[in-house]
Amino acid sequence: MANDSPAKSLVDIDLSSLRDPAGIFELVEVVGNGTYGQVYKGRHVKTVTAAIKVMDVTEDEEEEITLEINMLKKYSHHRNIATYYGAFIKKSPPGHDDQLWLVMEFCGAGSITDLVKNTKGNTLKEDWIAYISREILRGLAHLHIHHVIHRDIKGQNVLLTENAEVKLVDFGVSAQLDRTVGRRNTFIGTPYWMAPEVIACDENPDATYDYRSDLWSCGITAIEMAEGGPPLCDMHPMRALFLIPRNPPPRLKSKKWSKKFFSFIEGCLVKNYMQRPSTEQLLKHPFIRDQPNERQVRIQLKDHIDRTRKKRGEKDETEYEYSGSEEEEEEVPEQEGEPSSIVNVPGESTLRRDFLRLQQENKERSEALRRQQLLQEQQLREQEEYKRQLLAERQKRIEQQKEQRRRLEEQQRREREARRQQEREQRRREQEEKRRLEELERRRKEEEERRRAEEEKRRVEREQEYIRRQLEEEQRHLEILQQQLLQEQAMLLHDHRRPHAQQQPPPPQQQDRSKPSFHAPEPKPHYDPADRAREVQWSHLASLKNNVSPVSRSHSFSDPSPKFAHHHLRSQDPCPPSRSEGLSQSSDSKSEVPEPTQKAWSRSDSDEVPPRVPVRTTSRSPVLSRRDSPLQGGGQQNSQAGQRNSTSSIEPRLLWERVEKLVPRPGSGSSSGSSNSGSQPGSHPGSQSGSGERFRVRSSSKSEGSPSPRQESAAKKPDDKKEVFRSLKPAGEVDLTALAKELRAVEDVRPPHKVTDYSSSSEESGTTDEEEEDVEQEGADDSTSGPEDTRAASSPNLSNGETESVKTMIVHDDVESEPAMTPSKEGTLIVRQTQSASSTLQKHKSSSSFTPFIDPRLLQISPSSGTTVTSVVGFSCDGLRPEAIRQDPTRKGSVVNVNPTNTRPQSDTPEIRKYKKRFNSEILCAALWGVNLLVGTESGLMLLDRSGQGKVYPLISRRRFQQMDVLEGLNVLVTISGKKDKLRVYYLSWLRNKILHNDPEVEKKQGWTTVGDLEGCVHYKVVKYERIKFLVIALKSSVEVYAWAPKPYHKFMAFKSFGELLHKPLLVDLTVEEGQRLKVIYGSCAGFHAVDVDSGSVYDIYLPTHIQCSIKPHAIIILPNTDGMELLVCYEDEGVYVNTYGRITKDVVLQWGEMPTSVAYIRSNQTMGWGEKAIEIRSVETGHLDGVFMHKRAQRLKFLCGRNDKVFFSSVRSGGSSQVYFMTLGRTSLLSW
């Protein structure tokens, strides 16, 4: 290369004497940015391509630009430095700076940074790195010999020619050393490659450095070629400037490199520059010196350059970056270039000589140019005047165009506003239309309900009318039957006297009572015929009195006295029991004699009265309940007609059994038992099972109604005495047996549930803690409840017949269950759970673990009788136990519905479900991924498929997952995982492929990466502010702040670090005050503290001094609508309202009912606390209690995650197994809280 260029001092360079480049060079396109100007790809009109740096010459920069030209002119004549060809001045109109064109050698293969980016794995081979590093050191040795520091060595300032030659460029920050001092103290360069002594110049004005700072940058560039980027490149540049002087020297991360390479890096990166080897010493290093295959390396580099250009070729020629110190540009695509060859391009030396000759001619002609300029000044002034006019007109046109654009933009803005207004109006109309349709639908449903109610009322009236007619017909029949029986009685007495007048009656002690006779009932010896006639007459009259009193049945069903019926009879007649009474008693006691006995017809006064069966306090059946009112009315009419009332009704009971058969009752066998009505004054609160009650009612009806068919058959054959006696019982027995069969057939076809059915099953539905084992049911994981969530029963605690409308709180488990609700004495709603089969009431195991105590506002209680329940649930510190709030044992587990006509949609009701899957180890965290749930345990990561059958897919095993969050928009899962509690980021596409196995390319890639080198992470929080996603991390004794960097980085990069904190952080969050100031809020065992991100100052927000020992912080809740200034901090069993400066904002302390294990902020401005005895829901604004879910036994629960109205939490049972609970908070309920 030419070395004959005379060295000139700075004063010898006269910028005004440079020629205009017009006709010599022309610009083609921009290829990069330098420190003082843009770099163009240019073309010499007669020879080849050149690099042209175009700079505006201002008075402030004239000295620096002159210095750069001087450096290039003197020291660019080296094979490893881009050659300086010449400089030109392009004149500009008055008022504008002239342009300096700096023409240099064009390196067509781009920079080392481009080479690394275009290489697989973003790493170069070790022999390539050795070759490039040697060429860099040779160029630096040339500069250092001449006492010049480059000061900006980095990958982008090391270029390659098409022949794989290495050239140093960009002398924009180079400086010549003062020959006496030998050191510089100017702070300039690129941060990541900057030497520690250069950075120290900014902090200490007395600090100095020398040419060995370039050797540090050379070592960093070698690491860049080996690892794809310089150390600390994932940090903010100002953060890197802070860490480089303080961190130990960087080293190669991978172990694959040779010892010579490690040694070379170690030699370059010595922090004390006085001990750093010189350039000549590094050139003699074995890594640089021993390169036996240099020619082969150059061939490989050239072939790689050609392959990359062909692979990415989109244009005709290649363009590369010429980058400055402060700006890093994106990768520029490469294009087709000239054919590659090891031989130098012909004409290169001729071009250099031509530029030197042109430069010399410029100097000789400078004087002539000055004279010519003086002559042309007049012309220039005229031209300037003309140009000024043109510029004024042009400026005017530009202003007009701007005004037109402004008006057009204003018009477009108004049109957009009009469109938005129209869209808002359209949406408003659509919403009004939707509300109107919903109102119409609601009215239609109300109208249908009203019509159904009216139809039901009409049907009931028709049934009552039918029953009334039946009763009247039966009454008429009974009157006829009474007359026939009186006639028959007279005939029988007449016929009976004649045989007795002829026979001698035997003694009563020898009479065999065990042999019944239907032909001749033998009289007692001391009775005269008149007495016997009275006995028969009284027996018949007693049965008739019973038959004609239908209204007395209601009293017999509800009177608590078991001796009422017998007392009623004896008050009428002191005589022994009649024949019909005897028959009734023997039937009641379920006598198994196949034929009716004669004893009741011929018993003496000395006979012992058989034991009476006490009248059972039987509960009213559904049919009888519905027909109670009309019957009482009918009973009043009959009593006005002169009939006696009696409590032992026979024929009416048979009639009611017939009515029950004729009118099918829509009640279930399992739940349609009866309990005593609270309106009956003497009703007993105890109750029996429903099936048993109906059985007793039927058996009573059989026994007590049996005389009626016997009397009917007797009336048909009054002339035949023997047939009369023979037909009395068998006919009734056959009739009642058939009637019982029909009733049982009707019961079997009843629908399963009806809101008018009653059940009081204290014996069957009692639950204990021992019975709370989970009953697994296939497919019950995502089961939904049926539309009927309530059943009907009476409540002794509702006075004056008042009823309340409640919304049932559903607690789902592994089996479908039916909740029931009773208002307690304190006014608090207690939800319990009962189960019923479709036909029989069975003893079951309760699988519910929760007893909700809900604020009446939550359940939307609307009492039907005009009363309002206003009591709010209270909660004591020691917790309420379910046993303490139950009713008396006879009411335990009752099914209660206090608003039978109101059925609410399922979406309004809060639910708790438990997934069937049992995890072998404790669940530590979870996150929703779409609709499915990622579950992290002590032993791995799994996916719970909530969209299907609840299947669990294992994803990662033998790794502990402590915390996780899904960021679907970024395709990452952020976790704290592993034995060392590292912050790992998993790619969702990789996890998805582990389930689907449909992308082989994804399987080959690494599925996760770590955030920095952080270990021992305690807690983190992802905070989204506008479009920035911050990741604030609590370590054992420090807090780190990272920020997400989009493509091409696509990772979290370090933003701030706060180490050696006085209090070890346990909980961390980040707030943005008024959209301007970032503050880290963290909780420790001493209280809550804040860190100002900008200044790094740490101060206390709240220290609970009333607690002597250490505390456990639960949650930091940034209150909405406070510009990030106000907080609710929860610890132990309390919560305090403070602002970010430590001032108490509310004189309110949120007090949990017990010590919670987890506290979480949920939607609708509420917070939930999970304790061992209950789950509490409280308002985040006031701390008031909104609802409580009591546990039936103490258990440890942990909040996992939530979205909208869904909350997930887990339970840990003995042995370490866990299950996931899924809680849906009803939308309407939440909005009304």
UniProtKB/Swiss-Prot annotation:
<feature type="modified residue" description="Phosphothreonine">
    <location>
        <position position="822"/>
    </location>
</feature>
<feature type="modified residue" description="Phosphoserine">
    <location>
        <position position="691"/>
    </location>
</feature>
<feature type="domain" description="CNH">
    <location>
        <begin position="920"/>
        <end position="1207"/>
    </location>
</feature>
<dbReference type="GO" id="GO:0005737">
    <property type="term" value="C:cytoplasm"/>
</dbReference>
<keyword id="KW-0723">Serine/threonine-protein kinase</keyword>
<feature type="modified residue" description="Phosphoserine">
    <location>
        <position position="706"/>
    </location>
</feature>
<dbReference type="GO" id="GO:0106310">
    <property type="term" value="F:protein serine kinase activity"/>
</dbReference>
<feature type="binding site">
    <location>
        <begin position="31"/>
        <end position="39"/>
    </location>
    <ligand>
        <name>ATP</name>
    </ligand>
</feature>
<dbReference type="Pfam" id="PF00069">
    <property type="entry name" value="Pkinase"/>
</dbReference>
<feature type="modified residue" description="Phosphoserine">
    <location>
        <position position="907"/>
    </location>
</feature>
<dbReference type="GO" id="GO:0046330">
    <property type="term" value="P:positive regulation of JNK cascade"/>
</dbReference>
<feature type="binding site">
    <location>
        <position position="53"/>
    </location>
    <ligand>
        <name>ATP</name>
    </ligand>
</feature>
<comment type="function">
    <text>Serine/threonine kinase that plays a role in the response to environmental stress and cytokines such as TNF-alpha. Appears to act upstream of the JUN N-terminal pathway. Activator of the Hippo signaling pathway which plays a pivotal role in organ size control and tumor suppression by restricting proliferation and promoting apoptosis. MAP4Ks act in parallel to and are partially redundant with STK3/MST2 and STK4/MST2 in the phosphorylation and activation of LATS1/2, and establish MAP4Ks as components of the expanded Hippo pathway.</text>
</comment>
<dbReference type="GO" id="GO:0051549">
    <property type="term" value="P:positive regulation of keratinocyte migration"/>
</dbReference>
<feature type="modified residue" description="Phosphoserine">
    <location>
        <position position="817"/>
    </location>
</feature>
<feature type="compositionally biased region" description="Acidic residues">
    <location>
        <begin position="766"/>
        <end position="781"/>
    </location>
</feature>
<dbReference type="GO" id="GO:0006468">
    <property type="term" value="P:protein phosphorylation"/>
</dbReference>
<protein>
    <recommendedName>
        <fullName>Mitogen-activated protein kinase kinase kinase kinase 4</fullName>
        <ecNumber>2.7.11.1</ecNumber>
    </recommendedName>
</protein>
<dbReference type="GO" id="GO:0032014">
    <property type="term" value="P:positive regulation of ARF protein signal transduction"/>
</dbReference>
<feature type="region of interest" description="Mediates interaction with RAP2A">
    <location>
        <begin position="852"/>
        <end position="1206"/>
    </location>
</feature>
<feature type="compositionally biased region" description="Low complexity">
    <location>
        <begin position="666"/>
        <end position="692"/>
    </location>
</feature>
<feature type="compositionally biased region" description="Basic and acidic residues">
    <location>
        <begin position="521"/>
        <end position="537"/>
    </location>
</feature>
<feature type="domain" description="Protein kinase">
    <location>
        <begin position="25"/>
        <end position="289"/>
    </location>
</feature>
<feature type="region of interest" description="Disordered">
    <location>
        <begin position="489"/>
        <end position="805"/>
    </location>
</feature>
<feature type="region of interest" description="Disordered">
    <location>
        <begin position="305"/>
        <end position="348"/>
    </location>
</feature>
<feature type="modified residue" description="Phosphoserine">
    <location>
        <position position="621"/>
    </location>
</feature>
<dbReference type="Pfam" id="PF00780">
    <property type="entry name" value="CNH"/>
</dbReference>
<dbReference type="GO" id="GO:0005925">
    <property type="term" value="C:focal adhesion"/>
</dbReference>
<dbReference type="GO" id="GO:0120183">
    <property type="term" value="P:positive regulation of focal adhesion disassembly"/>
</dbReference>
<feature type="modified residue" description="Phosphoserine">
    <location>
        <position position="703"/>
    </location>
</feature>
<feature type="modified residue" description="Phosphoserine">
    <location>
        <position position="629"/>
    </location>
</feature>
<dbReference type="GO" id="GO:0005524">
    <property type="term" value="F:ATP binding"/>
</dbReference>
<feature type="modified residue" description="N-acetylalanine">
    <location>
        <position position="2"/>
    </location>
</feature>
<feature type="modified residue" description="Phosphoserine">
    <location>
        <position position="646"/>
    </location>
</feature>
<feature type="modified residue" description="Phosphoserine">
    <location>
        <position position="5"/>
    </location>
</feature>
<feature type="compositionally biased region" description="Basic and acidic residues">
    <location>
        <begin position="654"/>
        <end position="663"/>
    </location>
</feature>
<dbReference type="GO" id="GO:0051894">
    <property type="term" value="P:positive regulation of focal adhesion assembly"/>
</dbReference>
<keyword id="KW-0963">Cytoplasm</keyword>
<feature type="modified residue" description="Phosphoserine">
    <location>
        <position position="849"/>
    </location>
</feature>
<dbReference type="InterPro" id="IPR011009">
    <property type="entry name" value="Kinase-like_dom_sf"/>
</dbReference>
<feature type="modified residue" description="Phosphoserine">
    <location>
        <position position="799"/>
    </location>
</feature>
<keyword id="KW-0808">Transferase</keyword>
